[in-house]
Structures are given as C-alpha cells and as structure tokens.
Amino acid sequence: MSSMQFGAATEFSNRCGVTLMNTPIGRVVAEVMGAKEGVELTEYPSMIRVDGVKLLSFDYDELTDALGQEFDGSIFEEISSTHYGRMVHLDDKTMLFASPEDAAEYIGFDLTAQ
C-alpha cells in the first residue's frame, strides 16, 4: 500500500480513483482491484483508496465471485464515497477514466462535433 500525497499540480496525472469504506465488502473489492496491474491501494482506519492509471474497471461478475454474494451498482454506490476521474456506470461494471475523452464513447459525447 502506498502513502497519499496532497497538493496542487497543474499537469495531467493520467490517474483516477475512488475511496471505499473499510468494511468486509469494501476490503474484498479493494483486494480484487489491488491485484490488477497499475492499481495502488492506500489503507486508512475507515477507508481504502483505490487509485489507478488511465482506467479502473470494477467488474460486477468478478466481484460477485470474490465476495460469494451478488455485487452490483447499488452495492458499489453503498461502499464508495469520493472519486476522481470520469465515472461511468453500466449494467455489468463501473468504470473510472482518468481522461474524459476516454469515456466519451460511454457517455454519448462526440469528440468531433464542432
């Protein structure tokens, strides 16, 4: 687990992340995400930060298997609080994008429109 740094930076970080409640469900979700390449976890007494490069994808089937009980968007909303990056909810997963342009196809935004 890494340490959190605070401050203001003007350059693009290419990172996105979410804060999860440090509960039994939140901990399992963090462990699944922490096993993925480019994902860092920072643990605090009441929360777990999940930070990644470019994209974080919380696949509900993968999380259901890890938990042994159904995981869906409503449970994601229940265990998460703050986030940074563009968040997109789909039926089978929640994704966070570091760049809004990368999320454009999921949110109906036409990058070529004048």
Curated annotation (Swiss-Prot):
Pfam family, one: MmoB_DmpM
Tree of life domain: Bacteria
Gene3D superfamilies linked: Monooxygenase component MmoB/DmpM
Induction section of the entry: By acetone. Transcriptionally activated by MimR.
SUPFAM superfamilies: Monooxygenase (hydroxylase) regulatory protein
Annotated function: Effector component of the propane 2-monooxygenase multicomponent enzyme system which is involved in the degradation of propane via the O2-dependent hydroxylation of propane.
Family, as annotated: Belongs to the TmoD/XamoD family.
Full protein name: Propane 2-monooxygenase, effector component
Provenance organism: Mycolicibacterium goodii (Mycobacterium goodii)
Gene it is expressed from: mimD
